[in-house]
């Protein structure tokens, strides 16, 4: 790539870091950003900056929240005897859209993958174990491959 397109190549590289985004998709995204007005590009950059600065993990379930504790964990309407363990915060949004589950959640922030050097200590497993007490009667392990499609 010519020297003067290095910033574009860097942008492609950054987008390609996202799971599920290959070089082709990352290149499309980079060109979309380049086609934005300066104002739109700055809004995108600020949205990323604010999300990184203002959101953090709920101290109970590890989902992302602006407060110390997320709305689901604070809700008195949730069934506190059931915890659904999920891989990522995305999974919570997916389950919540079904309106079928009314328990609590716990986000592991990944899966054990010895080939990738990810063991139990890199995940939020000890936080899950700390939540298990006499009020928790059921733990559901959510697996994407077994989740029903909400349109069926």
Predicted regions and their residues:
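Conserved small/polar residues in nucleotide/adenosyl-binding loops
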Residues: 144-152
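Extended interfacial segments that mediate partner engagement and assembly in macromolecular machines
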Residues: 26, 75-140
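Short, well-ordered alpha-helical scaffold segments within catalytic/effector domains
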Residues: 12, 55, 67, 122-129
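Cys/His-rich Zn2+-binding cysteine-cluster or related metal-binding knuckle/ribbon modules and their
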Residues: 2-9, 17, 27-83, 88-92
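Post-transcriptional modification and biogenesis factors for structured RNAs
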Residues: 2, 14, 130-134
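Short amphipathic alpha-helical interaction patches enriched in hydrophobic/aromatic residues
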Residues: 15, 33, 140-143
């Amino acid at each position: 790539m010519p020297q003067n397109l290095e910033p574009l190549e860097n942008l492609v590289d950054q987008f390609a870091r996202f799971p599920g985004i290959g070089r082709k998709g990352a290149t499309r995204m980079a060109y979309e950003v380049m086609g934005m007005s300066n104002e739109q590009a700055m809004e995108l950059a600020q949205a990323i900056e604010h999300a990184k600065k203002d959101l953090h993990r709920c101290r109970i379930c590890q989902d992302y929240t602006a407060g110390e504790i997320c709305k689901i964990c604070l809700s008195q309407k949730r069934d506190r005897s059931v915890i659904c363990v999920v891989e990522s915060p995305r999974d919570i949004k997916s389950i919540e859209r079904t309106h079928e589950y009314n328990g609590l959640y716990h986000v592991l922030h990944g899966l054990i993958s010895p080939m990738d050097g990810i063991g139990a200590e890199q995940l939020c497993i000890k936080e899950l174990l700390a939540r298990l007490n006499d009020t928790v009667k059921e733990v559901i392990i959510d697996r994407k491959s077994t989740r029903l499609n909400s349109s069926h």
